Amino acid sequence: MTERGLCASGAQPFCVHSFAIERENAYYRDMFTEKINNFDLKEICISGQCFRMHEDDGAFTVIAGDRYLKVSQDGENVTFFCDREEFEGFWKEYFDLDTDYEAILAAVDPEDSYLMRAADTACGVRILRQGLWEMIVTFLISQQNNIPRITKCVENICRAYGRKCRAADGTEYYAFPEPEALASLEEDALMACNLGYRSKYVVRCARKIAGGSFDLEALKTMDYEEAKAYLLTLFGVGEKVANCICLFALHHVDAFPIDTHIRQVLDAHYADGFPFDRYRGFAGIIQQYIFYFELHGDREIV
């Protein structure tokens, strides 16, 4: 029932309304605006790397692990609805705000008309620094799947096995479940969350991690090639999934996941081979520009 409905009923409308305003004002005092270039919340949201970020009434909500953020944007002015301490301690790194994306965009070969168009279209995308365990599960789910279904599967798992939380503005949400929460399940238990055959991948990985035979903390210290090789020891993790985890969780920006979209681009535009040497140290960011462009760009004019 809306607040207007409560007032019409005579059920102590002043107290209800004043409490709501007081709570809202208290929340919105913890907010500030940063000017950020090469940053677009909409582009990030639909870039296929994060599945718990949603547009809501002109702003975006992000759930990362057990954290919740509301954030909005007007041009280069980005408003974070949290305090400075939380921003500096978590969200600044999460959104990769210390990386010079202007320099990366400037490094794109001007003679490469396809890549110039892709980078221009996706210039607001950033590689998020997301939780390792969450990305392992998410990209296991991503196999032979599409973005809306992946999003639904992730949310189903969180609602079924994650801890219920409440944000500062009163919004209820579910944290991403820890490995221990999934390790005790039967291999087909996540079928109810619409994971299909991927259910056994997630449960077996959860058991291996919860049991201590796969060390997430050690993985975080490895270089790209070591990390990829270690990830490939997990049941259900292949080359593409390992590269996605390396890129979106470990921030190994030389990781270059190749799915159907990227393979088609490589075949069509880079028959002699993609110039990895030119983009060494940020090839994964270039890959994300290509992926975004293939999903959302106007390819007819390329």
Regions found by a protein language model. Name each.
Residues 1-2, 31:
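Accessible peptide chain termini
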Residues 3-17, 24:
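N-terminal amphipathic/hydrophobic targeting modules at extreme N-termini
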Residues 25-302:
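HhH-family (HhH-GPD) DNA N-glycosylase catalytic core used in base-excision repair
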